[in-house]
Amino acid sequence: MNAATKLPTQLGPIHFTGIGGIGMSGIAEVLLTHGYTVQGSDLKPSKITERLERLGAKIFIGQVGENLADAEVVVISSAIKPGNPELETARARGLPVVRRAEMLAELMRLKSNIAIAGTHGKTTTTTMVATLLDRGGIDPTVINGGIIHAYDSNARAGAGEWMVVEADESDGTFNRLPATIAVVTNIDPEHMEHWGSFERLKDGFHEFVSNIPFYGLAVCCTDHPEVQALVGRITDRRVVTFGFNTQADVRAVNLTYKSGVAHFDILLRNEGQVISGCTLPMPGDHNVSNALAAVAVARHLGMKRDEIRAALAGFAGVNRRFTKVAELGGVTIIDDYGHHPVEIAAVLKAARQASEGRVIAVHQPHRFSRLASLFEDFCTCFNEADVVGISDIFAAGEDPIPGASRDDLVKGLIAHGHRHAVAVPDEDALEALIRAEAKPGDIVVCLGAGTISTWAHNLPARMG
C-alpha cells in the first residue's frame, strides 16, 4: 500500500487512454511521482506527452488495443467513447476501466482537498490557490486544467496534507470529488449537451457544495447572481463569500490598473482586517475576483497577510490565460483560451485596461452547438475590441449547424452595431489583418479553445 495514495503499490501498469489531455496528464504525473508504473496513448505527440515520457511514462502515439500490453487498469476521460479500440480491448480482457474523475477522487481520498468549480475562471483560480499555499509553506499537491507557468506543468506532487484540484462540471463528474473546501466562481449556461437544462446545471453546483463535510467550507462569488442564489440554498455548512460587492466577506476595494498591473486592497470583513497594497501582475477584474477566492482559502488555512500580498505580487500566471506570446514592432500578441461570450468580454475588457492603443480581437469559435445556442451573446461580447476577426469554427467533432458559421457571426456582429468585423479564413489572412490594422501600442488578442493558439504562436516567425 502506497503511504501517500493508499492505492496498492503492486498495481501493475496504469494505462491512460488519451494521456496527453490536460485533465488526464496531471493525474498521470502525480502517480508517476509516487512511483507507479504509468503508460498511455494519445493521437499525437505534444509537450505534455514529452514531459510525461521524461518522467518515466511509456507513451504510445495512436490508439490500438495492443497498446494495453500488460496494463492492469485503464483510465479514460469522458472524451473516450464506445468503440475506442483500447476501451474495447480492456473490456474484452475484463480489466477495470476507471473514469478520470474516479481516479482523481482516489488520489484525493486521504488528503484534505480544495476543489475549484465554476463555468469560467477555474484554471486561473486553481493556479492562484496553489501559488498562495505554496508560498505559505503548505506544500500542496496540485492537479490543474492548465499549465502553471511556475511549475511548467499542470501538476505538482506536494508533501503537505492539502490537495488543490480543478473540478470540471462539463460531464457532472465534479460531484464525485471529495472536497473539503468547495470554491464556486460563477455559474453560466454551458455544457447543455450533458446537463440538458440550466436548472439541472444549477442543481449540480448545489450538490457540489452540499457534498462538503460539516467541517468544510464553501467559498462563493456573490458578484454573480446565480452564485448568490446558490448561497441562499446552502444550509448547515460554513460559507465565505467574495467579490467586489459591499456584502462580500472578502472584498476588493480601491482597484486601479497601471501598465497592466492591478493595484487594490482586500477587506476581510469577518476579521475586521485589511490586506493593503496588493498587486496582481495581470489585468482584468475577473482575475482580481479569482484572486479573492484564493485569498479566502489562504486565510482559512492560516496564511499571514504579508505572505498573501507577496504571493499575489509574484503570481506567474497560467498558460493560455492572457499569455503574452510576443511583442512585434510595438504590437503585443496575446493568446487566450476564452471561448464563451462571458470569457471573451472579460478578456477584452482586460486588454483595454492593459493597453493604451487599440484592441484587435481574433476569435476561433469552438463548436457549432455553442455558437448556435449563444449566438446573440457572441454578437455582443466583442464591444471592447476595435477590430474583430472571426475564423472558421473549430468543430471538435461536431457537424455544421445552419446559421452558426463564420460568416453568420461576422454578419451578426455588424448587424448588432460592431463597426469593424471581418472573416479571417486562415493564417495568411490573420497576418494580413495585423499588418493592415495593428500599430505600435496596439494589442492583438487571439481567443479560442482550438487551433487559434498555434496561429498566435506562429505570428513571430510569420511577421519577422
UniProtKB/Swiss-Prot annotation:
Name the positions where ATP binds.
G118, T119, H120, G121, K122, T123, T124
What reaction does this enzyme carry out catalytically? UDP-N-acetyl-alpha-D-muramate + L-alanine + ATP = UDP-N-acetyl-alpha-D-muramoyl-L-alanine + ADP + phosphate + H(+)
Q: Which Gene3D superfamilies match?
A: Mur ligase, C-terminal domain, Mur-like, catalytic domain, NAD(P)-binding Rossmann-like Domain
Could you name the Gene Ontology cellular component terms for this entry? cytoplasm
GO terms assigned for molecular function: ATP binding; UDP-N-acetylmuramate-L-alanine ligase activity
The entry's family comment says: Belongs to the MurCDEF family.
Q: What is its EC number?
A: 6.3.2.8
Sorted UniProt keywords: ATP-binding, Cell cycle, Cell division, Cell shape, Cell wall biogenesis/degradation, Cytoplasm, Ligase, Nucleotide-binding, Peptidoglycan synthesis
Listed pathway(s): Cell wall biogenesis; peptidoglycan biosynthesis
Q: Name one Pfam family in it.
A: Mur_ligase_C
User: Which Gene Ontology terms describe the biological processes this protein takes part in?
Assistant: cell division; cell wall organization; peptidoglycan biosynthetic process; regulation of cell shape
Q: Which InterPro entries match?
A: Mur-like_cat_sf, Mur_ligase_C, Mur_ligase_C_dom_sf, Mur_ligase_cen, Mur_ligase_N, MurCDEF_pg_biosynth, UDP-N-AcMur_Ala_ligase_MurC
Q: What organism is the protein native to?
A: Dinoroseobacter shibae (strain DSM 16493 / NCIMB 14021 / DFL 12)
- Role played: Cell wall formation.
Query: Which cell locations does it reside in?
Result: Cytoplasm
EC class of this enzyme? Answer: ligase
**Name of the protein in question:** UDP-N-acetylmuramate--L-alanine ligase
Question: Organism's domain of life?
Answer: Bacteria
Q: What is its main location?
A: cytoplasm
